[in-house]
Protein backbone atom coordinates (compact mmCIF):
# COMPACT_ATOMS: atom_id res chain seq x y z
CA UNK A 1 0.00 0.00 0.00
CA UNK A 2 1.28 3.43 -0.89
CA UNK A 3 1.37 5.88 2.00
CA UNK A 4 2.12 9.58 1.70
CA UNK A 5 3.39 10.93 5.01
CA UNK A 6 3.03 14.52 3.87
CA UNK A 7 1.96 16.31 0.69
CA UNK A 8 2.74 19.91 -0.07
CA UNK A 9 3.90 22.46 -2.59
CA UNK A 10 7.02 24.05 -1.11
CA UNK A 11 9.34 26.51 -2.81
CA UNK A 12 12.97 25.43 -3.09
CA UNK A 13 14.08 27.71 -0.25
CA UNK A 14 11.32 26.31 2.01
CA UNK A 15 12.78 22.79 1.96
CA UNK A 16 15.63 22.32 4.42
CA UNK A 17 17.73 19.18 4.89
CA UNK A 18 19.93 18.64 7.92
CA UNK A 19 22.19 15.80 9.01
CA UNK A 20 21.45 14.04 12.27
CA UNK A 21 22.71 10.97 14.11
CA UNK A 22 21.38 7.70 12.76
CA UNK A 23 18.78 5.86 14.78
CA UNK A 24 19.09 2.75 12.62
CA UNK A 25 18.85 -0.23 14.95
CA UNK A 26 20.85 -3.30 14.14
CA UNK A 27 21.90 -6.57 15.67
CA UNK A 28 23.85 -9.62 14.51
CA UNK A 29 20.74 -11.34 13.12
CA UNK A 30 19.83 -8.31 11.01
CA UNK A 31 23.42 -8.00 9.79
CA UNK A 32 23.34 -11.68 8.74
CA UNK A 33 20.09 -11.05 6.83
CA UNK A 34 21.71 -8.11 5.05
CA UNK A 35 24.78 -10.22 4.22
CA UNK A 36 22.58 -13.06 2.92
CA UNK A 37 20.42 -10.75 0.78
CA UNK A 38 23.49 -9.05 -0.70
CA UNK A 39 25.22 -12.38 -1.44
CA UNK A 40 22.04 -13.72 -3.03
CA UNK A 41 21.66 -10.68 -5.28
CA UNK A 42 25.32 -10.90 -6.28
CA UNK A 43 24.84 -14.50 -7.39
CA UNK A 44 21.99 -13.68 -9.76
CA UNK A 45 23.25 -13.64 -13.33
CA UNK A 46 23.20 -10.26 -15.04
CA UNK A 47 22.54 -8.24 -11.89
CA UNK A 48 24.83 -5.28 -11.33
CA UNK A 49 25.18 -4.16 -7.72
CA UNK A 50 26.76 -1.07 -6.26
CA UNK A 51 26.66 -0.34 -2.54
CA UNK A 52 26.09 3.35 -3.07
CA UNK A 53 25.42 5.87 -0.32
CA UNK A 54 21.85 6.93 0.35
CA UNK A 55 20.07 9.33 2.70
CA UNK A 56 17.96 7.72 5.42
CA UNK A 57 14.93 9.71 6.56
CA UNK A 58 15.18 9.97 10.34
CA UNK A 59 12.37 12.48 10.88
CA UNK A 60 10.64 15.41 9.28
CA UNK A 61 8.40 18.32 10.12
CA UNK A 62 6.07 19.99 7.69
CA UNK A 63 3.89 23.06 7.64
CA UNK A 64 2.12 24.65 4.69
CA UNK A 65 5.16 26.94 4.25
CA UNK A 66 8.16 24.71 5.10
CA UNK A 67 9.49 21.17 5.00
CA UNK A 68 12.39 20.13 7.25
CA UNK A 69 14.02 16.77 6.58
CA UNK A 70 16.42 15.22 9.09
CA UNK A 71 18.59 12.59 7.43
CA UNK A 72 21.47 10.25 8.17
CA UNK A 73 23.61 8.04 5.98
CA UNK A 74 22.63 4.57 4.89
CA UNK A 75 23.57 2.42 1.92
CA UNK A 76 22.05 0.44 -0.91
CA UNK A 77 23.30 -2.80 0.66
CA UNK A 78 21.42 -2.05 3.89
CA UNK A 79 18.32 -1.06 1.88
CA UNK A 80 18.42 -4.30 -0.12
CA UNK A 81 18.81 -6.40 3.03
CA UNK A 82 16.12 -4.66 5.07
CA UNK A 83 13.47 -2.76 3.12
CA UNK A 84 13.54 -5.21 0.22
CA UNK A 85 13.56 -8.36 2.40
CA UNK A 86 10.21 -9.82 3.37
CA UNK A 87 9.58 -10.34 7.04
CA UNK A 88 12.28 -8.04 8.41
CA UNK A 89 9.81 -5.53 9.86
CA UNK A 90 7.64 -8.28 11.33
CA UNK A 91 10.64 -9.91 13.00
CA UNK A 92 12.61 -6.87 14.13
CA UNK A 93 10.40 -3.78 13.83
CA UNK A 94 10.68 -0.72 11.57
CA UNK A 95 13.79 0.71 13.28
CA UNK A 96 16.03 -1.76 11.40
CA UNK A 97 14.94 -0.50 7.96
CA UNK A 98 17.31 1.61 5.86
CA UNK A 99 14.38 3.85 4.82
CA UNK A 100 16.19 5.82 2.10
CA UNK A 101 14.45 8.84 0.67
CA UNK A 102 12.97 7.82 -2.65
CA UNK A 103 12.46 10.36 -5.40
CA UNK A 104 9.96 9.93 -8.22
CA UNK A 105 8.61 12.25 -10.82
CA UNK A 106 5.75 12.20 -13.26
CA UNK A 107 5.78 13.95 -16.58
CA UNK A 108 2.91 14.58 -18.92
CA UNK A 109 3.60 15.16 -22.60
CA UNK A 110 2.05 18.07 -24.47
CA UNK A 111 -0.43 15.65 -26.03
CA UNK A 112 -1.58 14.36 -22.63
CA UNK A 113 0.39 11.14 -22.30
CA UNK A 114 2.13 10.11 -19.08
CA UNK A 115 5.83 9.39 -19.59
CA UNK A 116 7.20 6.28 -17.90
CA UNK A 117 10.38 4.27 -18.25
CA UNK A 118 11.25 0.60 -18.25
CA UNK A 119 13.64 -0.55 -15.54
CA UNK A 120 16.85 -2.13 -16.77
CA UNK A 121 17.04 -5.93 -16.67
CA UNK A 122 20.29 -5.70 -14.64
CA UNK A 123 18.81 -4.01 -11.55
CA UNK A 124 18.37 -5.99 -8.33
CA UNK A 125 14.64 -5.44 -7.87
CA UNK A 126 11.71 -5.05 -10.27
CA UNK A 127 13.86 -5.61 -13.39
CA UNK A 128 12.13 -4.87 -16.67
CA UNK A 129 9.05 -3.31 -15.09
CA UNK A 130 7.38 -0.09 -16.19
CA UNK A 131 8.20 2.55 -13.62
CA UNK A 132 8.16 6.32 -13.09
CA UNK A 133 11.52 8.02 -13.45
CA UNK A 134 12.93 7.62 -9.97
CA UNK A 135 15.92 7.25 -7.73
CA UNK A 136 17.08 7.89 -4.18
CA UNK A 137 18.54 10.88 -2.40
CA UNK A 138 22.32 10.62 -2.04
CA UNK A 139 24.62 12.47 0.37
Model regions and ranges:
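N-terminal leader/linker segments that precede catalytic domains of diphosphate-processing enzymes
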Residues: 1-139
Amino acid sequence: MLTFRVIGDWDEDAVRVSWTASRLASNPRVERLIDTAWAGARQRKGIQLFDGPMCRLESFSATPTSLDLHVSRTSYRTFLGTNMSLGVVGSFGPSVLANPIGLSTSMQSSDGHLLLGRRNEAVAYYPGRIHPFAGAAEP
